[in-house]
């Protein structure tokens, strides 16, 4: 199929996302979204087959959407679909391609320089440092020796992470007794072969100071470099080496002055990166509970169903507002949340699943909107080291952030995953906690 076969494509998506297509199905007419994806990913993920059920899909075309160094010639060689009005990244690895296509076609977008910064945590650290945005001490890591030296200089603790991955993949919190050589090997080999093309830019790594404090994210709609909508999400993470999220709550219950500080910090980051149009998902640690320090920032919509929580709390559709903005129009924006919403991820013992019970009971609890369990009998529950490995989640609402969070936690506690061979130290389903 060629682009000329889908002249009615309104939206071009750089990188295939089933979740995003599902959301667009409720917003756009049939045959209005063209997906561009790496040929390798199309084949491995069977994208043509899996995307066929989405009414909004106009077609799937092979394109080098993950060749960030070649983004400009890729965009120059891609015929512009008739009627296209917006380009969006479907996945983290499509952020640069989306910006390049928007620039080539004269459409609002992130801006290619900003997209490149946001796809590289090392470049983001440089940009934040130049703008005096508070952040942890850090350095590029080329091997285990760099990590060991940094840890020794920072009190025996550090964070090791890839500079250009997603979903907490390869991120490790290291203490004084952790084996640096083994940790480096785990981070350097972490990959997503069904999501990331083999020719994509090589991995780079950084080591950072470990900061303590509550962790939040700020979701921001940006128009002409100016933030027009802010949301603050509270997050909790699992304890241990791998800081994978256990839950999110919208809106975060914070003092007004802390919210103001986050707004100011995010505005400074927008200016520092030169971001033009679209949505940003910035993560921050509140040092001493009040002072925002930058963790990282993505030039795309948030994952973990945070967009759903924002829609439930604020009303309307964050995605629809982003599309309106990317078409050069001004979206109607909510002034304040009308309720709260929360997501809580399941935890489970490690081993072969014998049974899953309690899902119906969880779904019947007042305020619970969604229960999804990703494991079943005879399946396997492994240790959670990244976001893809979590065994399920619950979404709930409430009049307040506390009420929504407590409802989600009760629902998770009602679900039991029984395994045949527990791994020593594993937690029972529904009992995991921990906060950044």
Could you tell me what each predicted segment is?
Residues 1-114, 145, 330-331, 348, ...:
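ATP-binding N-terminal substructure of ATP-dependent carboxylate-amine bond-forming enzymes
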Residues 6-7, 260-283, 288, 298-354:
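Active-site "cap" helix and flanking loop/linker of ATP-utilizing ligase/carboxylase catalytic domains
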Residues 104-170, 188, 192-195:
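A conserved helix-loop-beta module that forms one wall/lid of the active-site cleft
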Residues 134-136, 157-160, 177-212, 243, ...:
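Conserved ATP-binding module of the ATP-grasp superfamily
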Residues 141, 171-176, 221-223, 287:
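Short beta-strand-to-turn element immediately C-terminal to the catalytic PLP-Schiff-base lysine
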Residues 172, 209, 251-254, 311, ...:
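Short, well-ordered beta-strand elements within core beta-sheets of diverse protein domains
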């Amino acid at each position: 199929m060629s682009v000329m076969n889908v002249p009615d494509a309104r939206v071009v998506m750089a990188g295939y996302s089933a979740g995003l297509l599902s959301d667009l199905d409720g917003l756009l007419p049939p045959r209005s979204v063209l997906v561009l994806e790496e040929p390798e990913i199309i084949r491995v993920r069977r994208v043509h087959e899996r995307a066929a059920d989405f009414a909004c899909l106009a077609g799937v075309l092979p394109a080098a959407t993950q060749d960030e160094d070649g983004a400009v010639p890729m965009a120059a060689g891609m015929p512009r679909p008739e009627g296209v009005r917006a380009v969006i990244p479907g996945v983290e690895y499509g952020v640069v391609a989306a910006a390049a296509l928007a620039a080539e076609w004269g459409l609002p977008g992130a801006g290619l320089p900003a997209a490149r910064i946001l796809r590289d945590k090392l470049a983001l650290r440089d940009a934040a440092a130049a703008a005096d945005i508070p952040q942890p001490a850090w350095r590029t890591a080329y091997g285990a020796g760099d990590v060991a030296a940094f840890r020794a200089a920072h009190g025996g603790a550090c964070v090791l992470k890839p500079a250009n991955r997603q979903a907490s993949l390869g991120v490790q919190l290291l203490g004084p007794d952790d084996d640096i050589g083994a940790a480096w090997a785990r981070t350097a080999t972490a990959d997503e072969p069904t999501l990331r093309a083999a020719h994509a830019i090589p991995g780079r790594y950084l080591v950072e100071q470990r900061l303590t404090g509550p962790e939040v994210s700020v979701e921001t709609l940006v128009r002409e470099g100016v933030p027009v909508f802010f949301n603050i999400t509270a997050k909790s993470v699992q304890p241990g080496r791998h800081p994978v999220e256990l839950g999110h709550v919208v809106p975060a219950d914070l003092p007004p002055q802390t919210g103001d500080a986050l707004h100011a910090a995010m505005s400074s980051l927008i200016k520092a990166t030169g971001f033009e149009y679209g949505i940003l998902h910035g993560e921050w640690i509140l040092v001493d509970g009040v002072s925002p320090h930058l963790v990282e920032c993505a030039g795309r919509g948030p994952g973990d169903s945070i967009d759903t929580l924002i829609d439930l709390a604020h009303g309307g559709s964050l995605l629809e507002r982003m599309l309106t903005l990317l078409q050069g129009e001004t979206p109607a924006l909510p002034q304040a949340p009308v309720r709260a919403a929360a997501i809580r991820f399941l935890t489970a013992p490690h081993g072969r699943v014998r049974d899953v019970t309690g899902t119906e009971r969880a779904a019947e609890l007042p305020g619970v909107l969604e229960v999804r369990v990703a494991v079943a009998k005879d399946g396997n529950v492994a240790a959670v080291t990244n976001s893809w490995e979590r065994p399920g989640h619950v979404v709930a609402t409430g009049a307040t952030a506390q009420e929504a969070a407590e409802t989600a936690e009760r629902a998770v506690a009602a679900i039991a995953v029984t395994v045949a061979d527990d791994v020593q130290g594993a937690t029972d389903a529904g009992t995991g906690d921990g906060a950044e």
